[in-house]
Amino acid sequence: MRLTARILASGAAATLLLAGCSPETTGTATPAPSGPPSASASANPAVPKVAAPLDVSKYVSKPCDIVPSSVLSSLRFTNPGHTQLQDEELGAAGPGCGWKISGEGVSMQVIIGTGNRDRGAGGLTGLYGAHESGQFPFLEPAPDVDGYPAIYVDKRDRRPIGNCVMDVGVADDVAINVYAGGYEGAEDSCAAAQKVAASIITTLKGA
């Protein structure tokens, strides 16, 4: 399976960038913001800053490696991930990787939002700007991930139906979008997304 256009026209959670697509697809992430955030968004005091930026460059060419296989296995994703490298269409938000559990409709996707950064719409600032412009009507702070700020962001809040879209700021201009879809509800989908997000921070700290 290849990451869908909906994911990445992502127009990536958040990112990647990243968010909101339909629950009928095997997966979706936050679509990329359509343009640079406005000056008011850039200065928005609600946008959390990243105190200790992390370097994602090592994983831009191999985004599937950013999530440890042990973490994926613990979530029952045993099939290889499917890579979508950045391009002008499907990968506009940045490079990503998708996994699925065969026969269950459960999926996990990650997008590294370097494409959003390069367009001047990167990081949580870009997502807050997209929220303010109405592109992503739903945005809510999420628990920090190992000290890194995070948000839930989507076209609408789909957590109750088992689709959790979150973005974690790893630098002020780069966010990583994590999408967990096809779960029973908000608790299990967001727990899975948070577990993957935490493993990504651990990976980046050790890179």
Regions found by a protein language model. Give the residues of each.
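Bacterial N-terminal signal peptides that target proteins for export
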Residues: M1-G11
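C-terminal motif of bacterial Sec signal peptides marking the signal peptidase cleavage site
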Residues: L17-G20
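A small/polar (G/S/T-enriched), proline-flanked helix-loop surface module common
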Residues: T25-P31, G35-A207
